């Protein structure tokens, strides 16, 4: 049980004093209480109580930052991403959550954007897949805002002079908060998930590993990704909206 105690100690900084732990619960679930931001989580651990992962449950209201990375460029007008951004705003507010937003292509004020990250419990990055990654405007936004947030969003890279090879990426100050990707791709889902296809069965999140890691560098953890596929050759906008609302309900739940 030594590993379980070590994991619990690691979790305590995120869960806070109100966390409740039950070892040996059915299915290997460690039941925990409310996080500091009001959200509820369960922790599932492995047989040896040495591995765990978070599963999103219902919550009180959550402060959610919505970032619209849609952009008109080439054959893309950006409308689908704007529509999904607006769908998220309406659906989350209807569920009782609080939202702030930035339409990246319309410009932004760096101190205000840093303040939004300090305010949020979760951030949703809405963006198309361009040449196997985010649009340059979204990456530029991340570069500028995260850099402007030095000392507020992250303290350092997590290492110390005593252990210069250990702890890289652990200096984030937004621990206990979360990030989610909402993506639009012309590629079918099978291009990501099917072995032998373009991405070799690696999955969507593997394609976005650097983007996830950039968010994790400031301390956030990953929520389930949402993706709309085949958006140019076989668009199903009404179904995308229905699916997205269901995804948001599953991830965040009503306040």
Residue ranges and their predicted role:
Residues 62, 81, 198-255:
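Glycine-rich phosphate/pyrophosphate-binding loop and the adjoining helix
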